[in-house]
Amino acid sequence: MLFARLVLLLVYLAPGSLAKPASTKKRTQWDQIAIDACAKELESHKFDTDVKGRHATLCTYEPALGSWLHCAKDVLDSRKKSKKIFEKTFSKINQYCHDYHKDEVVSNEEYYRIFANASLFIRPLDEVKENIRYPVTPNKASLDRWVWAYFGPLDNIDKGNVYGVTICLYWIGVLFIAAVYHFLNFSRLKQTVFKNKVSAFLRGHYVLPALVHNHAMSVGRWFFIGLVPTRLETLVLFGYVLLHGFLLSSYNFDHNELLSDRRSQVLIFLSDRAGILAFAHFPLIVLFGGKNSTMTWLTGIRYTAFITYHKWLGRFMLVDCTIHAIGYTYHAYIENYWKYVKYSDLWTSGRHAMIIVGILVFFSFFFFRRHYYELFVITHIILAIGFFHACWKHCYKLGWGEWIMACALFWIADRILRLIKIAIFGMPWAKLKLCGESMIEVRISKSSKWWKAEPGQYIYLYFLRPKIFWQSHPFTVMDSLVEDGELVVVITVKNGLTKKLQEYLLESEGYTEMRVLAEGPYGQSTRTHLFESLLFIAGGAGVPGPLSMAIKAGRQVKSNDSHQMIKFVWSVRNLDLLEVYRKEIMVLKELNIDTKIYFTGERKDESNTEEGAIANMSTEGRLLTTSKSAEMITDFGRPNIDEIIEEAVSGAKSLLVTCCGSEGFVDKTRELTAKRVLEHGDKWIEYVEEFQNW
C-alpha cells in the first residue's frame, strides 16, 4: 500500500488541508451572558426615552446604561466572577453601541463613573411600571430565566468539549491499567498477587474466555459475518458504550423556552454534543488502527484487540455523525432555513463527510476484509482521506480542528516509525522455494546488525515484483538453524498475494530470488522463564511462533541448567509441513523437549490390487514408507487438548499455554485453558494466543 500511503501524505501536506482552522475556545463567557441576559430583561421594560434601534435605549440613555452595568455586575457577583470579568463587559457594550457612539470608544473610567452615579439613585424595578427615569435593578427571578436561556446552549458546547476529553481519558485509563498488568509480567510479583481463587474466578470467567464460544472464528453466514470480541474486550467496550450514552444524555434545557422551543433545543443540543463527540474519536481511531508496536510493548494489548477497539470506535463515530447530521437537517427544515444553507461550504462538506463515512464503514465489514482484503485496504485509505478532508473543511471556521491535528500527528508518527523499521531492515535478497503444493519457504539474509526479531514476532513482507510490490501481509518470522544471519518465513498459499507468488514460482521451476522489504518486527516475546511449566500448542501452519518460542525456551533451560518442564504439541495433516520444519523439530528433540506430533491426515481407501494392498496398509505404515518426516510423528488423530493442559498443570505451580493454529483450534484451546484456570485457583495459568485475525 505504498502508493496509497504516499497519496495520503500528499493530502496532509496540501496547502488547503493545512490551513489553520478556528481554534476551539470556551464558549461560556460570563461577561457575554451577563450583558445579553440583562439587555433582554431591561429592554422588556419602558424607559423614558423615544430613541429607536437595537440596544438604542441601553446605549444612549444613561439611567438605562447604568441599569445595564449594575445588572451585569450583579449577575457576575452571584457567580463569584472577578473584577477583570466585569471590565470585559465594557468592551462588549462598546461593540453593541458602536453605531451610536460612532468612532468614539467609551473608556473604562467613564463606565465606572456611570456605574458609580447609578449606584446613588438605583431602585428595584418592581417599584415602577413604565417611563423609567432612573437606574433600576431587575427582578431576580425574571433575570435568572434569561441567564439560564443564554447559558444552556453555550454550556452544552463546553460540556461537549469536556466530554470529548472524557472519552479519551477513559481509553487512557484502559491503557494504563493494561500497562500496569503487563509490566507485572517482568517479575514473579504477578504470580504472587494474582494466584488466588478470586483472581482465578475473574480471569477464568471474564479475562480469558471468548464472549460465547468463538473469538478467532467468525460468526454469521454469507455477507453477514463478523468477529466476536473476548469477554474482557467486551467489558471494556461495554464500559465505553455506557459512558458514551451518558455523555449524550445530560443537558441544561431552558424550560421557559425564551429563546427557542423545547424541540429546537433538543435538536440543537443533541446535534452539537454528538458532533463534538464524533470529532473526539479521531485520535483514538487512528491510534488504535496503526501498527502500534510501541503501544503493544507498553500495554501488552495485542494488535487484534486494538483493531477490535478501532472498529467499534469507528462505528460509534458513525452513530454520532448520523445524529449530528439528521438533527441539524431536521432543524433546518422546521425553522425554514434549509434553502439558505444547503449549498454553503459548511453544509456541503458535512454531507460529503456523512456519505464518505457511511461507505467507509460499509466496506469495513468482515466480508470484505476476508474475501477482498486488498480492496478493503485501498478503499479504507482513500475514503479515510476524503473523510478527513471533508471534516477539516466542515470545522475550520467553527473550531475543533485540534482533534484532526492530533489525529494527523498520530498518523504521521506511526508512518515515520514504520518507515524507520523498513529502512533499518534494508532491501535484501530473498530466496523463495515452493514446498509441496501449498507452501512457500522464504529465506532472507539480514543486512543490518541492528535488526532483531524475537520468537513469536511477525513482519509485514513486501515482495518487490511489478504486480505485487505494493501489497504486504503479516508472516511469523524465525531465525534459520542452517545459516547465521538468515531469517525464515513459511507462507501458506491462499488467495491474492500468496497465490501470485505461487504462480510465479511455478513459472520459475519452483525457485526464485527477489528483493524484499520488511516492516517490523511486531508483537512481543513472552517471558517464559517466569513459569515452571511451558506448553506450546500448534495447529497446522500456525507452528512457527510456538516452535521458535519452544526452541528458545529449551536453549535457556539447557544453558541455565534449570528444571523447567517444556512440552511441544503439534497437530498437522500435511506431510509437506513436517518436511519444512524437520530441522527445527529435530532441535526440539536434541534439547530433550517433550515433543508430540499428531498426524490428522485423511485415510484413503484404494483398490484391492497388489498395488492397492500396499495403499491399504495402516496410515502409520503408508507414512513410514513414503516420507522421512514420518519418523517425527508420535500419534495419529486429533490431540486431546483438555488432557494435555491438565497434565501440564498438574505437576507445576505455574503454567504458560501458548497456542497458534486455525480459528477453531485456538478458540477451543482458549476455552479449555480458562476452564483450567477456574479449577486450579491456587496456580498461575497464563494463556498467550499467537493467532491474529481482524
UniProtKB/Swiss-Prot annotation:
List of residues binding FAD: H473, P474, F475, T476, V477, M478, D479
Which subcellular locations apply to this protein?
A: Cell membrane
Q: State the signal peptide span.
A: 1-19
Q: Keyword set for this entry? A: Cell membrane, Electron transport, FAD, Flavoprotein, Glycoprotein, Heme, Ion transport, Iron, Membrane, Metal-binding, NADP, Oxidoreductase, Signal, Transmembrane, Transmembrane helix, Transport
Name the principal localization, coarsely classed. membrane
Glycosites: N117
What name does this protein carry?
A: Ferric reductase transmembrane component 5
The organism named in the record is Saccharomyces cerevisiae (strain ATCC 204508 / S288c) (Baker's yeast)
